[in-house]
Regions:
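Non-heme Fe(II) oxygenase metal-center motifs and adjacent flexible, charged/small-residue loops
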Residues: 1-113
């Protein structure tokens, strides 16, 4: 695919006090982020959850970390275990954690953890 902005440097686009878009911020980390997605989805594949009303969600999703968002006939929950495997969600990949921290610092939140 042709990237018309391949030569553009990352930049920040302030939206409002305390909110900014970090354009192209994650591009240099793309390979590590995709590896992290592969690691998560190997253990907890993408799936279409069903709402309490019985409708299948159009978005396929998975989770990682201590809690994951899930839905079932009883409602919406944050769950420690994957409802399909009853195993804990995969740990959040280090590349995700590093990106979150570095983006928060770049956006003006130096104490983010």
């Amino acid at each position: 695919m042709l990237d018309l902005f391949a030569d553009a440097e990352p930049w920040q686009e302030p939206l409002a006090p305390g909110a900014t878009i970090l354009r192209r911020f994650a591009l240099s980390r793309a390979a590590a982020l995709f590896d992290g997605i592969d690691a998560v989805t190997t253990r907890s594949p993408f799936r279409h959850m069903v709402t309490p009303g019985g409708y299948t969600m159009s978005v396929a999703m998975t989770n990682c970390g201590e809690l994951g968002w899930a839905t079932n006939a009883r409602g919406y929950v944050y769950a420690a275990n994957d409802p399909l495997t009853d195993q804990p969600w995969p740990p959040m990949p280090e590349a995700f954690q590093a990106l979150c921290h570095d983006a928060a610092v770049a956006a003006g939140y130096p104490d983010f953890r």
